[in-house]
From Swiss-Prot:
The lineage of its organism: Bacteria, Pseudomonadati, Pseudomonadota, Betaproteobacteria, Burkholderiales. It catalyses: cytidine(32) in tRNA + S-sulfanyl-L-cysteinyl-[cysteine desulfurase] + AH2 + ATP = 2-thiocytidine(32) in tRNA + L-cysteinyl-[cysteine desulfurase] + A + AMP + diphosphate + H(+). The gene is ttcA. This is tRNA-cytidine(32) 2-sulfurtransferase. Keywords: 4Fe-4S, ATP-binding, Cytoplasm, Iron, Iron-sulfur, Magnesium, Metal-binding, Nucleotide-binding, RNA-binding, Transferase, tRNA processing, tRNA-binding. Its EC number is 2.8.1.-. Its main location: cytoplasm. The thiolation reaction likely consists of two steps: a first activation step by ATP to form an adenylated intermediate of the target base of tRNA, and a second nucleophilic substitution step of the sulfur (S) atom supplied by the hydrosulfide attached to the Fe-S cluster. [4Fe-4S] cluster binds at C114, C117, C205. Binds 1 [4Fe-4S] cluster per subunit. The cluster is chelated by three Cys residues, the fourth Fe has a free coordination site that may bind a sulfur atom transferred from the persulfide of IscS.
């Protein structure tokens, strides 16, 4: 397979972004065993490819085990992933669990099955990780997924909550990591096309994409068309939170604010971002030649001395 210079730049960029995310959040450490979850989609294929490349030159030792869950969906091509994983030479496990029948039994026809399917799949993944001795579980969610989830939670859940690059499972047994957290979906898609990954469609179950998620995704794509770079800016905002400029009393001690010694800087008080109002500059505050600044107070309704009184 011959690749262009553009492809090599793309590959380098994805590896660099994943490496930076791994470093920023300490996703992978020396001695880790990482269970790499493969669905057969573009994101998980790209994640495995990037992790294998980083593993070869990493200054630490860690183990990768690829995992695919065969959920017994009708038409699922059972030989595709084993064939690919043997070809690339990575240790792997195929887990068979008929979650498909459970989902079809529990969810009414025509309804979205993704939520229940995800919960069942998560349980199988956690159990498999424990059996294999894997302390890290790698998922293929990317930057766009994180931003999309942020708006879903804000619009429909009333929370400023996204999808964290790293988190502990509820029982504390494993750490879930998302190495593609800094990677854009369009670049992952371009990489997957160039690599000619054997993609397995995600709609074999017959479920429709969640309507709310679809609408938010369309909204973000339209924003990106109108103002390229907007998704990048939104993701950057998730990394630059200013609790004093929100309204969550659990994040910032508003009740503890007092006069006297400032608890936040003047820049934070008056703002320095592009869409804040211009900072208020007090007369004389930046000029040592002015020793005293006087102001006059005019009691309500009283005209200054010597001024003409208004006509009755």
């Amino acid at each position: 397979m011959t690749f262009s210079n553009n492809f090599h730049r793309l590959e380098t960029r994805l590896q660099s972004q994943a490496g930076r995310a791994i470093g920023d959040f300490k996703m992978i450490e020396d001695g880790d065993t990482v269970l790499v979850c493969l669905s057969g989609g573009k994101d998980s294929y790209t994640m495995l490819s990037v992790l294998m490349a980083l593993q070869k030159r990493a200054p630490i030792d860690f183990k990768l085990i690829a995992m695919n869950l065969d959920q017994k969906q009708p038409g699922f091509p059972e030989d595709v992933l084993p064939g690919y994983l043997k070809k690339v030479g990575v240790e792997y496990v195929i887990v068979e669990a008929d979650t498909y029948s459970i989902v079809k039994e529990k969810v009414p026809e025509g309804k979205t099955t993704c939520s229940l399917c995800s919960r069942l799949r998560r349980g199988v993944i956690y159990r498999t990780a424990k059996e294999l001795g894997a302390n890290k579980i790698a998922l293929g969610h990317h930057r766009d997924d994180i931003v999309n989830t942020f708006f879903l939670n804000m619009f429909f859940g009333g929370k400023m909550k996204a999808m964290p690059p790293k988190l502990a499972t509820d029982n504390g047994d494993h750490i879930v990591i998302r190495p593609l957290a800094y990677c854009a979906e369009k670049e992952i898609a371009a990489y997957a096309r160039a690599m000619e990954f054997p993609i397995i469609p995600c709609n074999l179950c017959g479920s429709q994409e969640n309507l709310q998620r679809k609408k938010v995704k369309e909204m973000l794509l339209e924003w990106e068309r109108q103002a390229p770079g907007r998704i990048d800016n939104i993701f950057s905002a998730l990394q630059n939170v200013v609790p004093s400029h929100l309204a969550d009393t659990d994040l910032f001690d508003f009740n503890g604010l007092t006069t006297g010694l400032a608890k936040i800087g003047e820049e934070a008080l008056f703002g320095q971002t592009a869409y804040d109002q211009a900072p208020l500059v007090f007369a004389g505050s930046h000029d040592d030649r002015i020793e005293f600044v006087r102001f006059e107070r005019n009691p309500a309704g009283k005209a200054p001395e010597g001024a003409e009184q208004p006509a009755a």
